[in-house]
Amino acid sequence: MLTDTQIREIRSRFNIFKHKIYLNSCSQGPLSDAVQAGLEDFMASWHEHGSPWELWVNRYEAARAAFAQFINASPDEVAIVTSVSAGINGVASALNFQERNKVVMGEFEFPTMGHVWLGQRVRGAEVQFVSAEGNCIPAANYEKMVDRNTLIVPLTHVCFKNGFRSEVNAITQIAHRAGALVMLDDYQDCGTRPIDVKAMDLDFFVTGTLKYLLGPPGLAFMYVRQELIASLVPTVTGWFAQANPFAYDPKLFDLSPTARRFESGSPSVPNVYAALPGFQLLREIGMEKVAAHIKKLVQSLLSCAHDLGIRAKTPADSAGPLVVLQCQDSTSFVQKLAESNIVASNRHDGLRISFHVYNTMDDVTAVVEVLKKNIDLMVRGPARVGSYD
């Protein structure tokens, strides 16, 4: 468990906490001194050398190796892409919908996941959505729909609008028993607890750096299980997907034998420089400690909301780093928080409060005080069962 002194030291590395209470890591993580130094390092290399591509590519590969270690994968199983959307599109373009054509996903997915797979209907995909029960989607609901005609099960780890954490292990087992692939979107969780893609038995894993990995927008990582790589030929591609990008031969289509075949154009070098320190900072702290600290904060806010009679959209027994409370007017409540120098966000009727390792129990107390003063803006009573509103 992290001590108060350790948390204060971590918090001091993020300038925003000098004047704000920041509880919006589910949208964008705050800027640390380490990430700022990474960006300045890139600027210095650009000023000094102009176009030091050998240096930049080395840093690019260092980021790949760091992320691979972060999720217990091989660097050859990791693609660096511009966004999670780009990674998902790359995988979708490589799949054949002739023998199996069903894509089964929950209705809590981020819109990109639905849009990408619905876009594959012109190639023969049949997209089916698993219905929720209240603010949860039980694994049993997937079992009713996944069958021998299912090609892939795209799955969000933590829902962006209610904080529900999916039963990843159970759903993965259901999919694999039917011979289907599993893709996990971990954007709303990665960086808040240890991740082991091998232990989770995943086929694909995608996440970006801008939230809990404490990095910039414009950079994402995708894991592809080693045994699958050679059989997948993405048609969403580019020169950095080739075995030798620097061959400069437009007549040669020679994909990398590694997950790099899912990459595309020139890498976003500034974002690579900024992302690497985010990984390093989290690893220095220790992911087990990060997870334990976040869990304590989440449980505290959920308990306080319960005591105030406020309806939580986040199930207490399956929560990630994001707590969502139901509002009469979520936009107005976010403004009320802003008036107290608290940064949060909303989606539909949900107030989103997200925690990370730099947050404290004092942050929870500050939110609770605003809740008490504006209780009329909140929805009262227990969470509804049987509908997601």
Predicted segments — roles?
Residues 1-389:
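Pyridoxal 5′-phosphate
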